[in-house]
Amino acid sequence: MADTLAGKTLFITGASRGIGLSIALRAARDGANVAIAAKTAEPNPKLPGTIFSAAEEIERAGGKALPLAVDVRDEAQVRAALETTAATFGGLDIVVNNASAISLTTSQATDMKRFDLMHGVNARGTFMVSKFAVPYLEKSANAHILMLSPPLDLQEKWFAPNTAYAMAKYGMSLVVLGLAGELRRKRIAVNALWPRTTIATAAIRNLLGGDAVMRASRTPDILADAAHMIFLKDAGSFTGNFLIDDTFLSENGVADFDRYRVDPTVDLAPDFFVPDDSKPPASLKKLSG
């Protein structure tokens, strides 16, 4: 397989900031085309980045960018965005379902509007983007769909503190399980990628404790590097995998994980939904908790 994404076209949801933008920038450094499918067209004082600022960064990194204002809950917007992407760049090779809504609340503290948002974005949005991307991906020589979602480790401890969010996030992983089997004969790979530790994004800062958790996190670059490696795999054989970022990178020759740490002096904070039997690479320093 090729060792570059040069000339490939990616459609990434939630790519105006954070993990989605990091994946986009890693592809852009290869010379890829990137459609930025996100809601943020106007600046938000609480969340940095818009589809237009992301497009500027992608272009500076060496890629070609297409900013698209898209709500992944809206069928017409999703269909139109995929059609525009394929028409602009002459096809579609990779879809990244990164957009996600989160509310770390108990059942009694979760209002139904928030419940519907999480399921509409996470499970339904992921299914819909993937579904409508298939006719374009079928024409690619090495098509990939990637979900930023956890391994299917259905334990009470993951659900009890925030049932609605866990349901919605695992819903994305169920899409992986189903579509990997359905699309295997079409040679469209469908995989999931999940971080072992918290990742330094605005969402983590706002939801999990501000600067202290940020210092105990890794940068989004670890997921960007892992995603890049996934996209270079043969789609006909590398599918149906639920991957933890550092384990996958270690298995593919990466040994230095300190470069991803925000603060190397602080113990790393573990993320949600990492299975108990998922062992970190031997070179990984201590996690807290």
What residue spans do the PLM features occupy?
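Short-chain dehydrogenase/reductase
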Residues: 2-89, 102-103, 113, 260-261, ...
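Active-site loop of short-chain dehydrogenase/reductase
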Residues: 8, 63-64, 91-92, 137-151, ...
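Conserved Rossmann-fold SDR core element
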Residues: 27, 91-93, 173-176, 183-195, ...
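Substrate-binding pocket helix/loop in short-chain dehydrogenase/reductase
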Residues: 106-107, 111-116
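A short, exposed helix-loop element centered on a Lys and neighboring polar residues
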Residues: 130-131, 177
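Catalytic loop of short-chain dehydrogenase/reductase
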Residues: 138-139, 143-185, 194-199, 209
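C-terminal helical subdomain
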Residues: 192-193, 211-289
